[in-house]
């Protein structure tokens, strides 16, 4: 029977969801969807001191915002401690793991000797075959009997064949601490196996964990999944992406007015490509994405590319989707008359949703003040008179074309040019010298409102 391809995303809720984490989640999601498989979400919250309910909530909110739907219920490792203990006991009973009674002092002494001899710090296996009376006052840890020689080899979907010499990278590592809590590598293996995870796509910072996990899969008799280790995202300076490069929290991008469609499109291209194509919808990606085509080398974050993609999606997504995202930012475009026309007015120049919000407010609301720099630059006695004459002559124009034809005729009669009038009109109508096409703004506002705003501006200028 052919097993169902199953991937997972398994964040630790000790902080916000980083965009590198979102890219990992996206790769796992797309691979599962392409193959009709399952995409699971597991919260690795065994570190009870550092866990945060707010962080867990933020991870789930980020998934919802991005439209990455996981299958089944969320799995919480903190609810599975009894299960992990069962498997620790199983390995102890089978002689594949053992109690280690090494004291803190013994461990420090061993490390000091190894350091002095310029050896790699490692546990020396002194309790591996211990059968004597356990020393008093020591709460033991549990260690796995790891291979002491030979190679651990696996075929990575991104990096190709990966080899580790057991003696170079491994000692009998701890699977349960002295307080009984399981370690990271142990819980990951138990959960991936029992959840039926067949393919693991994760950052290559986990590469060094893989040989240890393979040792555990083999000791427990579980099938080893296929691994794909993806290179990190770097900043534009070539260093590992961090807060100094800009936003890294997924939900910060939402607050910045970035659309989830743009962010996902941007992230999938940081490490994967399909020909020279730049723009991919989520539906496209579900058909096209292949983790075997992920680049081996690190990708560089490019803020300009994200801005370009965001502008593209603002231009092309339907009104309902743009307004749904605007509502999440506390702004509802649909309350305005001619809302669709207003969006079309603004979307051609907008780079973020805040450009839509600010642009809509500047057009819909009569200006309470005027950009003084723009006034100084573009307004003078001559064009104030021209503006007054323009307002007085406006009559029954309705469409942008009506206003354009009227303006051209008016300027011809006055022997003036559009540059003499366009900026004063913009400033009078919106308070700023930056706006969409003045003819479309005139159409949106209508003759009466335009006259009212121009008259108000002229009064402020002493006319």
Swiss-Prot record:
InterPro entries: aa-tRNA-synth_I_cd-bd, aa-tRNA-synth_I_codon-bd_sub2, aa-tRNA-synth_I_CS, aa_tRNA-synth_I_cd-bd_sf, Glu-tRNA-ligase_bac/mito, Glu/Gln-tRNA-synth, Glu/Gln-tRNA-synth_Ib_cat-dom, GluQ/Sye. The keyword Protein biosynthesis applies. It is found in: Cytoplasm. Its EC number is 6.1.1.17. A motif ('KMSKS' region) lies at residues 240-244. Keywords: Aminoacyl-tRNA synthetase, ATP-binding, Cytoplasm, Ligase, Nucleotide-binding, Protein biosynthesis. A motif ('HIGH' region) lies at residues 11-21. GO terms for biological process: glutamyl-tRNA aminoacylation. It comes from the Bacteria. GO terms for molecular function: ATP binding; glutamate-tRNA ligase activity; tRNA binding; zinc ion binding. It catalyses: tRNA(Glu) + L-glutamate + ATP = L-glutamyl-tRNA(Glu) + AMP + diphosphate. ATP binds at residue 243. One of its GO terms (cellular component) is cytosol. HAMAP family: Glu_tRNA_synth_type1. Catalyzes the attachment of glutamate to tRNA(Glu) in a two-step reaction: glutamate is first activated by ATP to form Glu-AMP and then transferred to the acceptor end of tRNA(Glu). Belongs to the class-I aminoacyl-tRNA synthetase family. Glutamate--tRNA ligase type 1 subfamily. Monomer. This is Glutamate--tRNA ligase 2.
């Amino acid at each position: 029977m052919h097993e169902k391809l199953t991937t997972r995303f398994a964040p630790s809720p000790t902080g916000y969801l980083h965009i590198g984490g979102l890219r990992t989640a996206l790769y796992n999601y797309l691979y599962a969807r392409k193959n009709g498989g399952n995409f699971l979400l597991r919260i690795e919250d065994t570190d009870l001191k550092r866990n945060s309910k707010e962080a867990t909530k933020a991870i789930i909110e980020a998934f919802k915002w991005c439209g990455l739907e996981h299958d089944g219920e969320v799995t919480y490792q903190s609810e599975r401690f009894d299960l992990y203990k069962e498997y620790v006991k199983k390995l102890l009973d089978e002689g594949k793991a053992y109690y280690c009674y090494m004291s803190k002092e013994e461990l420090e002494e061993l490390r000091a000797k190894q350091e002095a001899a310029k050896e790699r710090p490692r546990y020396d296996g002194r309790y591996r075959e211990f059968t004597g009376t356990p020393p008093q006052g020591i709460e033991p840890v549990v260690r796995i009997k790891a291979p002491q020689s030979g190679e651990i080899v696996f075929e990575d979907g991104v990096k190709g064949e990966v080899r580790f010499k057991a003696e170079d990278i491994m000692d009998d590592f701890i699977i349960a601490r002295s307080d009984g809590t399981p370690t990271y590598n142990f819980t990951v293996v138990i959960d991936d196996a029992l959840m039926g995870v067949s393919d693991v796509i994760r950052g290559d910072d986990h590469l060094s964990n893989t040989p240890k996990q393979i040792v555990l899969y083999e000791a427990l008799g579980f099938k080893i999944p296929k691994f794909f280790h993806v290179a990190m995202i770097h900043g534009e300076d070539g260093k590992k992406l961090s807060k100094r490069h800009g936003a890294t929290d997924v939900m910060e991008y939402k607050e910045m007015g970035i659309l989830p469609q743009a962010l996902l499109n941007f992230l999938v291209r940081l490490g994967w490509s399909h020909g020279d194509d730049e723009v991919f919808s989520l539906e496209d990606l579900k058909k096209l994405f292949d983790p075997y085509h992920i680049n081996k080398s690190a990708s560089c974050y490019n803020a300009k590319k994200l801005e370009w993609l965001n502008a593209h999606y603002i231009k092309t997504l339907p009104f309902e989707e743009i307004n749904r995202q605007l509502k999440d930012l506390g702004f509802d475009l649909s309350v305005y008359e001619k809302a669709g026309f207003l969006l079309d007015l603004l979307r051609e120049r907008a780079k973020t949703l805040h450009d839509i919000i600010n642009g809509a407010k500047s057009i819909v609301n009569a200006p309470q003040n005027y950009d003084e720099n723009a006034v100084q630059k573009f307004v003078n006695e001559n064009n104030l008179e021209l503006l007054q004459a323009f307002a007085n002559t406006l009559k029954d124009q309705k469409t942008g074309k009506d206003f354009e034809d009227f303006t051209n005729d008016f300027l011809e009669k006055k022997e003036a040019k559009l540059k003499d009038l366009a900026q004063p009109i913009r400033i009078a109508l919106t308070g700023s010298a930056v706006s969409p096409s003045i003819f479309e703004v005139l159409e949106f506002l209508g003759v009466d409102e335009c006259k009212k705003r121009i008259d108000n501006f002229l009064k402020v200028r002493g006319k």
